[in-house]
From Swiss-Prot:
The protein's Enzyme Commission number: 4.1.2.-
Cofactor dependence: a divalent metal cation
Protein name: Hydroxypyruvate/pyruvate aldolase
Residue numbers binding a divalent metal cation: E152, D178
């Protein structure tokens, strides 16, 4: 029996738009609720969310029967961390701050068993192989894993052609907030120069046959990115949706107006 199909990977390779949500509360119950909301993918955020390996596993369990595919964002692209998360049952990993093709190539290697990569054996005692009940797991694991790298600096944009040429990179995710900050526009993704770079990057990613992704809290931007061919677009986060809804509810009964949320995301 091979490893189960990664629906998210299949969809983005087919160019089918996937709408997602960020999970930053670090709670399994929140993930479980989000899994009923109709999103195609949900990011368990290990970079900015209050997560560790155990809380990530709890959220993976909570989403096990959900139609939404979990994507785990690692805090940093270290091979040992990637190995742990893959063994824990994560199949799609999002890696922040990938600035070069060399970094991307190293990440691809960390995702796969030898001879293709350097992933250490050990899934037989972990969730990934259903605790050794998926007999062909090691042989089929590569088919199910999906690597998304984040381009969120000028260095990454400058090396984007080479990053896109790395076999085994399934998609490139543009980090608009960090990119804007690196370009000198801290907290200002609305700047025309920033938007021009983002749009050009999406077009380039799609033209190279890779999946393009992004997160913003701005509906107009998100629809524009989908028009340009972005295939995995996150449109909100659990923390902000929860906070904004509560503030609006309170304001409706107590008078006044709720604080205006950021449109950019992160």
């Amino acid at each position: 029996m091979p490893a189960p199909e990664n629906r998210f990977k299949t969809a983005i390779h087919a160019g089918k738009p996937q709408i997602g949500l960020w999970l930053d509360m670090g709670e399994a119950i929140t993930a479980e609720i989000a899994g009923t909301a109709g999103f195609d993918w949900l990011v368990i955020d290990g970079e900015h969310g209050p997560n560790d390996l155990r809380s990530i596993i709890d959220q993976l369990r909570a989403l096990a029967t959900s139609p939404a595919e979990p994507v785990v964002r690692v805090p940093v692209g270290e091979s040992w961390m990637i190995k742990q998360l893959l063994d824990a049952g994560a199949r799609t990993l999002l890696v922040p701050m990938v600035d070069s093709a060399e970094q991307a190539s190293d990440l691809v290697s960390a995702m796969h068993y030898p001879p293709r990569g350097i992933r250490g054996m050990g899934a037989a005692v972990a969730r990934a192989s259903a605790f050794n009940t998926i007999a062909d797991y090691a042989d089929s694991a590569s088919d199910g894993v999906c690597l998304l790298v984040q381009a969120e600096t000028r260095a990454a944009i400058n090396d984007l052609d080479n990053i896109l040429a790395v076999e085994g990179v399934d998609g490139v995710f543009i980090g608009p907030a960090d990119l804007a900050a690196d370009m000198g526009y801290l907290g200002r993704i609305d700047e025309p120069e920033v938007q021009a770079v983002i749009e050009a990057a999406i077009v380039k990613i799609v033209a190279a046959g890779k999946a393009a992704g992004i997160l913003t809290f701005n509906e107009a931007y998100n629809r524009r990115y989908l028009e340009l061919g972005a295939s995995f677009v996150a449109v909100g986060a659990d923390v902000t949706e929860f906070a904004n809804t509560l503030r609006a509810l309170s304001a409706r009964y107590k008078g006044g107006s709720a604080p205006q949320p950021s449109r950019s995301g992160y």
